[in-house]
Amino acid sequence: MKRILVVSGLSGAGKSTVARVLEDIGFFCIDNLPPALLNDFMVLLSSSSIDKVALVVDIRSAQLGNAVQAIKKLVDNYSNIVTVLFLEASDEELLKRFATTRRRHPLEGQLSLQEAISKEKELLRDMKEMSVVIDTTGLDIHTLREKIGSLLKEEAQFVIRIRSFGFKYGLPADTDFIIDTRFLPNPYYDRKLAQLNGTDQEIVNFFSKYPVVEDFIQYTYKLLHIAATRYKSEGRPFMTVSIGCTGGRHRSVYVAEKLSKILKDRFYVYVEHRDVNK
């Protein structure tokens, strides 16, 4: 079966670097493919002997809206073989990279560099929702290679994508399950814990005091295990589970991390925290 990776994301986040990594591990890479040609390329690929392809889609200001729609259509039409990788990095990291390379951001124009970065994030929000997100902040080439290798490990293997999010920032657009954790005890109201997130030990200690949290995690695990087993038997390549709390910082992150650790005993699991830094 063919495997198509669409590499997209924020300017300066490392798309070209990721393309080189993918090329090194056996992918045929096409850089800067115009989104309008995606469908034509898939038609050509259907009669080709090439099995693993990475398409780096370079999205410029005049094409943003059409590009997002073109990639969404591609995913809808070829969901069994297409995965979108969305590369991002912190604002501080992006500012540093642009300063180092002395390249202009494609949206800069009349905007400052910081404004251009913020504008691009907003324009690509829908793209990010349908993608597997890779944060390249602070990653050297060797660590990035390991991260991508881990992501692509056992390519034919069924994957569970677990995403934490905050309801206040909107529902995820592309998901199979939405799990609401807003009824659980909230560490936000403890001033010492408010600025931490669900991966911090202090938050772990907080939730360990409430049996209802562990009960909820165990019941949710049983539900997801049943669903994942069925999805896998039906030939589905992945299952996406979105776990939400009010702001996406404490409860949803903690539950997502706990569930991923349990599910990893039986499935390949990929975790991302959409709103943890907002």
UniProtKB/Swiss-Prot annotation:
It comes from the Bacteria. Pfam families: PapZ_C (PF22740), RapZ-like_N (PF03668). The keyword Ion transport does not apply. Keywords: ATP-binding, GTP-binding, Nucleotide-binding. The keyword Transmembrane helix does not apply. One of its GO terms (molecular function) is GTP binding. GTP binds at residues 58-61. ATP binds at residues 9-16. PANTHER family: RNASE ADAPTER PROTEIN RAPZ (PTHR30448:SF0). Belongs to the RapZ-like family. Displays ATPase and GTPase activities. This is Nucleotide-binding protein Tlet_0523. It comes from Pseudothermotoga lettingae (strain ATCC BAA-301 / DSM 14385 / NBRC 107922 / TMO) (Thermotoga lettingae).
